Amino acid sequence: MARSIKKGPFIEKSLYQKVLSSFGSEKRVVIKTYSRSSTIIPEMVSLTISVYNGKTFIPIYITEDLVGHKLGEFSPTRIFRGHAKSDKKGRK
């Protein structure tokens, strides 16, 4: 179910304050966050935000196409290494 429009997008307060403080400065700073559930808002465009996936911080460069998505969508927590090969195909 989608979030109500009257509530607005969810963004963690500390992350929002970091975005606003880096918005005014010309220095390119990577913002680290654990908040995977925060929504990407238009103020974040052209910033680099590192999202924690449980092991490392994965840097994400925010573009206009990403607005409205959650930060956690772009930092996968599981690694798929493929299915095991079965040797039964060759034997008969």
From Swiss-Prot:
Keywords: Ribonucleoprotein, Ribosomal protein, RNA-binding, rRNA-binding. GO terms for biological process: ribosomal small subunit assembly; translation. PROSITE patterns: RIBOSOMAL_S19. InterPro entries: Ribosomal_uS19 (IPR002222), Ribosomal_uS19_bac-type (IPR005732), Ribosomal_uS19_CS (IPR020934), Ribosomal_uS19_SF (IPR023575). The keyword Ribosomal protein applies. GO terms for molecular function: rRNA binding; structural constituent of ribosome. The keyword tRNA processing does not apply. It comes from the Bacteria. One of its GO terms (cellular component) is cytoplasm. Gene3D superfamilies: 30s Ribosomal Protein S19, Chain A. Protein S19 forms a complex with S13 that binds strongly to the 16S ribosomal RNA. Belongs to the universal ribosomal protein uS19 family. This is Small ribosomal subunit protein uS19. It comes from Borreliella burgdorferi (strain ATCC 35210 / DSM 4680 / CIP 102532 / B31).
